[in-house]
Regions:
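The feature captures the beta-strand-to-loop junction immediately N-terminal to the Walker
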Residues: 47-49
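Short, glycine/charged-rich "phosphate-handling" switch motifs in NTP-dependent
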Residues: 231
């Protein structure tokens, strides 16, 4: 199959997905029959108010359900495999490898006792995508592509030794290191000031385009999603 056709084919196909959450001693609908299609190299903006179910849906695209949630109907097709029907042990081969996640709080995602370079390369080495030497060279290239200062040495620092905007970009490098097919950005710039937010968004957009990675960008900010996304979906009351 040609690369052109591969890009045209859906990477993720979500069909009539229904998810419930448990609260007040009963199950409540969160996602109510959502349909989505995401192609390789495409950035989908997922926008909605707080509590609309954006993060639940974004994680579900990776086949992951948060504690207290359950899938009650529909399909999550990843290159034809229905993630909704797989056991967690079967989905482990995708998580942190072919699918990665960038959270809102970079600081909470890093181990303060480990150098940035070691955390950036961990998945690529663990899944045997690259050896340690090649993974570190690639991490430096990612740092440079993300406009981090001193890309050849910033990885020797610890999380507390860089700014919030820099740490957010290192987390993007960590997510890109295994060259995933899908990356989910969950409001990763919310805690940053406006100037830093623009810098980080630009760097994220450029690197996703460079590696032809499909992405879901979750936010409540229309201006942010307009800068990142090729297509925008609005989630409201689970629809």
């Amino acid at each position: 199959m040609s690369s052109k056709n591969q890009k045209a084919d859906p990477l993720i196909q979500i069909n009539n997905l229904k998810i419930e959450g448990f609260s007040d001693e009963q199950w409540h609908p969160i996602i109510k029959g959502v349909n989505l299609t995401l192609k390789r190299g495409q950035v989908m903006g997922l926008i909605g108010e707080s509590g609309a179910g954006k993060s639940t849906l974004g994680l579900a695209a990776m086949g992951y359900t948060q504690p207290g949630c359950r899938i009650t109907g529909g399909e999550i097709l990843f290159e034809g495999d229905d993630l909704a029907s797989l056991r967690d042990s079967e989905k482990q081969k995708f998580w942190g490898n072919r699918m990665t996640y960038v959270a809102q709080s970079a600081a909470a995602s890093f181990n303060p006792a480990h150098r940035l370079i070691d955390q950036t390369t961990a998945s690529a080495i663990r899944f045997k995508i690259k050896n340690e030497t090649d993974a570190k060279k690639d991490a430096q290239r990612l740092y440079e592509a993300l406009n981090l200062p001193n890309p050849e040495s910033i990885g020797d620092r610890y999380p507390h030794q860089v700014s919030g905007g820099q740490l957010q970009r290192v987390m993007t490098a960590m997510a890109m290191s295994p060259r995933p097919d899908l990356i989910v950005f969950d409001e990763p710039t919310t805690a940053l000031d406006v100037t830093t937010q623009v810098e980080v968004l630009t760097a994220m957009k450029n690197i996703v385009e460079e590696f032809n990675t499909a992405a879901i960008y979750i936010t409540h900010d229309l201006a942010v999603v307009a800068q990142m996304a090729d297509v925008i979906k609005v989630l409201r009351y689970g629809n």
